[in-house]
Amino acid sequence: MSSQNSFMASKKEDKGKNIQVVVRCRPFNQLERKASSHSVLECDSQRKEVYVRTGEVNDKLGKKTYTFDMVFGPAAKQIEVYRSVVCPILDEVIMGYNCTIFAYGQTGTGKTFTMEGERSSDEEFTWEQDPLAGIIPRTLHQIFEKLSENGTEFSVKVSLLEIYNEELFDLLSPSPDVGERLQMFDDPRNKRGVIIKGLEEISVHNKDEVYHILERGAARRKTASTLMNAYSSRSHSVFSVTIHMKETTVDGEELVKIGKLNLVDLAGSENIGRSGAVDKRAREAGNINQSLLTLGRVITALVERTPHIPYRESKLTRILQDSLGGRTKTSIIATVSPASINLEETVSTLDYANRAKSIMNKPEVNQKLTKKALIKEYTEEIERLKRELAAAREKNGVYLSSENYEQLQGKVLSQEEMITEYTEKITAMEEELKSISELFADNKKELEECTTILQCKEKELEETQNHLQESKEQLAQESFVVSAFETTEKKLHGTANKLLSTVRETTRDVSGLHEKLDRKKAVDQHNFQVHENFAEQMDRRFSVIQRTVDDYSVKQQGMLDFYTNSIDDLLGASSSRLSATASAVAKSFASVQETVTKQVSHSVEEILKQETLSSQAKGDLQQLMAAHRTGLEEALRSDLLPVVTAVLDLNSHLSHCLQNFLIVADKIDSHKEDMNSFFTEHSRSLHKLRLDSSSALSSIQSEYESLKEDIATAQSMHSEGVNNLISSLQNQLNLLGMETQQQFSGFLSKGGKLQKSVGSLQQDLDLVSSEAIECISSHHKKLAEQSQDVAVEIRQLAGSNMSTLEESSKQCEKLTSSINTISQESQQWCESAGQKIDSVLEEQVCYLHSSKKHLQNLHKGVEDSCGSSVVEITDRVNAQRQAEEKALTSLVEQVRDDQEMVGEQRLELQEQVQSGLNKVHSYLKEELRNDVPTGTTPQRRDYAYPSLLVKTKPRDVLLEQFRQQQQEYLESISSVISEAVEPPVEQDSLEDEPPVAVNDSVISERSCIDLSMTCQEKGGIRFFQQKKALRKEKENRGNTTLLERSKIMDEVDQALTKSKLPLRMQN
């Protein structure tokens, strides 16, 4: 019953379980605060993650994240750690499991504090209520509490082991000498367990005894002060608690359940340089680091599943062997420091703990002992101890040294193991002998039954052999016929293989042709796409050019209209101003002549009045007046007539200038008409070019569509040819090759035509574009020359007008000087006449004075009228000259601006035409793709294949050949029989020899019944060997006939049935 319970419990735990890893971070201590160290560790208890900042303080990217089963931050209390980690494990210990909890980490990170804790200064706290108490006191308190509440009978034993400098010491030893070293042996009952010889296990009955034991062990444990920890543990300690619990089954059987809990407080790893350890302390630190390094290598080997795990390299790892990868439930508490000065050790501890998570243990419940077995074990132990005690008291026993005693104990253990092994082998062999004896008896009974059956079957066999002989003859005949058919089938198979190879070759050639068609199709599709894109681009470009030319035509028309209007306005203004100037001059001349005539007549009248005064004076006066009149007329004729003539000449010259301006306007109109005709013709040529390119591209597209339809037709015809190829082989192959070749030649010719049409389109586009460029350039040059000529003529006319105006000014000045001269001469004549009249007639002095005044007034009026006329004429001529200069200057500037604009338009048209040409060249040279020969298209060839099929001879002819072969080989039958049949041998020799093997050349084709019977009689020939022999016989069928081989097989069977094989051979 106990074995059943243990089996069921262990079956539930067959599946491995990972080691539980817990991380606890302590707060900052005084040393770290003095060093101004910052925190590099963040603990997230909810997400069970630890974040380590490996970079600078502000570096957010330099973080490493670790995930564990539980995470406790600096603020975590002792009771929280105990309830989360130890309470579930304690329940499993009470269930009968072996469990281990050990603390791992750097020195000074709180391992001993976590495992043992401290006593508060306030004595009112008990161990279980003390907030600073560790795992060990709380565990023991809860063990007694739980077992007492359940009313279970139990016993608790504790032991405290110290590992110092790779030596074992018992901290609970009753002897005052703590330096006694303990020895460790492998446990023969548990392959992964160890036995510590001389380790004291103390039975405790209540929690108070446990506390005294803890205090005694803590006092004996080796500690020392270093620079990093004032109370640094210099050794590893293993506190073991073994619980024996009594339970009663349903049947009333009393069982003892055993649970064991190992609480391990490891010494911390330390940096000797930082801890200040020297001499003895340095050796201690080296041994501690060595054992912890071995523990790390064991963890790494378990994680990586290496074949060798170095448990024996350290006493610590050897003790923890069952806890790491064994049948124990294990939990690791990794203690770390949050300070930046301990970053390297913290990262190392977290890496070890992270690797330890992957270790798989297979926990098993300890086997429960019955009360009788436990009492027996205790009784034997008591008797052994009594004997040892009596021998020690009486001193009549054997006393040995410890080394000899250990050697003797080792030999005894090894001999016990060998005895156990041999005992197990003897038991197994006895069981095997028993089974063999039973099998022998069964076989003997079966043999007797088989003998009886055999006698009955022999009679049936004799009857069956007669039928079998007849069947064999028929089978031999059928086999011969079948062999003939097989030969024919092989020949037909060879012929079919040749035909299939021919079909494979043709299929490869057809695949090459398909690839050629696909390449052609891909090239044509690419060219068609490029062709459509090119047509759209050319359409857009020519539309842009046409719109640009139309805009430029409109601009040129407006420019020429502006030139015409400007020149017309200038001519009208000049004509009106010249007419006004001529009328003003004529009016001035008429007013002067009228004034002079009036004054002269008035003077004559006045002089005639005085004629009576003195005839002589009258005569003299008349002479003087006549002389003065004649002189005045001559002066007017000689001085004023040339001026009037010059003004008239100036008027005619201005009208000639107007005619020249009209001629220039006519030239500008003709130039305008030339420009209109040029742009109209250029638009027509561009439109024609567009229509030609569209028609050419449409023809190319239609040719491409037809070519595409031809390719589709060729593909359909090709597939039909391939289908016909399978049925009619070579003839259809030749026909298909010829048709495919013709279609390819047709495709090539069409492709050549398409290429020629594209080439002609390219030439037409080049020709039309070059003509358009030349036409534009010639018209541009012509327009520039004509504009230059117009500008030169306008400048010449402006120069001639300027000279005319200057001449007019000179004539006006000359007229003014002539009038001044006449007035001076008149004044001189009047003075002389006055002197003569004064001398002649004093009485006419008053009259002369009045005449003098009158003449002076006349002179002054003539001067005023002439001066105002001259000023008016001069102002009008200057205004006319300035207006004409301004108009001509603006016209010249406008002509220059228009010339620059025409140059820009010419450059823009040239760029557009050049870009169109570049697009055409790139389309014809780069975008159009040619079918590049790959060299993989199959060539035309002839295919060799068999044309005749083998036919099997008729059945009658085959049977006649079979009978002839039987007659030919009858002589060789007797020799074969004599070699095959051997004399009987002795039974002893048969027992020594291996099983008989039949010669492969003797075995013939037999029925399934014969094969099974032969295998039974021979007793060692495997079925596949006979199949192999039969295969060989089929290959060498031409050497011996089937009938003779069947007879030989019968002889061999008879010889084999007569042999007396032992029973072992038959079985």
Swiss-Prot record:
It comes from the Eukaryota. It holds the Pfam family Microtub_bind. Keywords: ATP-binding, Cell cycle, Cell division, Coiled coil, Cytoplasm, Cytoskeleton, Microtubule, Mitosis, Motor protein, Nucleotide-binding, Phosphoprotein. InterPro entries: KIF11-like (IPR047149), KIF11-like_kin_motor_dom (IPR047241), Kinesin-assoc_MT-bd_dom (IPR025901), Kinesin_motor_CS (IPR019821), Kinesin_motor_dom (IPR001752), Kinesin_motor_dom_sf (IPR036961), P-loop_NTPase (IPR027417). In unfertilized eggs, shows highest expression in the germinal vesicle and radial yolk-poor channels. Also present in testis. One of its GO terms (biological process) is cell division. GO terms for cellular component: centrosome; cytoplasm; mitotic spindle; nucleus; spindle microtubule; spindle pole. CDD domains: KISc_BimC_Eg5 (cd01364). Plus end-directed motor protein required for establishing a bipolar spindle. Associates with both interphase and spindle microtubules. May be involved in nuclear divisions taking place during the development of unfertilized eggs. Required in non-mitotic cells for transport of secretory proteins from the Golgi complex to the cell surface. Heterotetramer of two heavy and two light chains. Interacts with aurka. This is Kinesin-like protein KIF11-B. The gene is kif11-b.
